[in-house]
Amino acid sequence: MKIIDFDELYSDKPHIVLVLGYFDVFHLGHKLLLEYAKKEAEKLNAIFAVFTFSNDISSYTDKTEPIYNFEKRKKLFALLGVQLLITAKMDQSFKSMSASEFSAKLKEKYNIKEIVVGMDFKFGKNRESDFNVLREEGFVVEVMSLLKDKHDNIINTTDIKKLIKSGNIKEVNEQLTFTYSVSIRNCIEGSNGEILADIDTNLKNGNYICALECYDKHSSEFPCTIKDSKVLFKKSVLGGIIANNKLDDAELYILREVNRKEKNS
């Protein structure tokens, strides 16, 4: 996957099928967008591209802090087959850019075969414009329907963040493209054979079943305790998969809450 800055100029203006979105978490609705765009790019002999922001945009929009940082999002975009990632930094200048200005920049830089967005897509100054403006500007635009969960509610990032905060990790994972995970850092080995580490999450304090991935090695499932953005688990669960307990590059997958049987075992 190639990563470029939105301000870069290209002499060859590559032909692309472009998905527009922030993607601070990859839920099933996002997966639908990306899979459709990938197939369209293959059909049109074009590059499968995504435009997104590389920084936390919560200071400039009504969005809350992202679930996944940019480093993790880059990895997930690559796993989904994105060939070209076009990134911009949200700032006051970009926030003030009109929809027409943004559209003109897209036309200037790329040969866009098709743009793919969700039904709820908004852009431009104060997010006042939608996909109809893109069509008025001459783009071919595919608007994807919004997916619903088992409760007949539209799957969206805001509700997923609420589910994380409430500890309903089962429903979180049902709505995500990838199992919910957090990066581990600042690991400390305790005297009783336990590992304590920091994690970036506002997941409800509690006991969960987790798994670790580090340097392409995977652990078995194990119980852990999450409290105040820290995780505690027994060192023995590593089973020798991680040399020298270097866990600062590890990913902790949070699979489900501990059930009654697991609590008593």
Language-model region placement:
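Phosphate/ribose-recognition catalytic cores of enzymes acting on nucleotide-derived substrates
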Residues: V182, I188-S265
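General small-molecule cofactor/ligand-binding pocket signal
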Residues: K2-I4, L85-A88, E142-M144
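A glycine-rich helix N-cap at a beta->alpha junction
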Residues: K72-I86
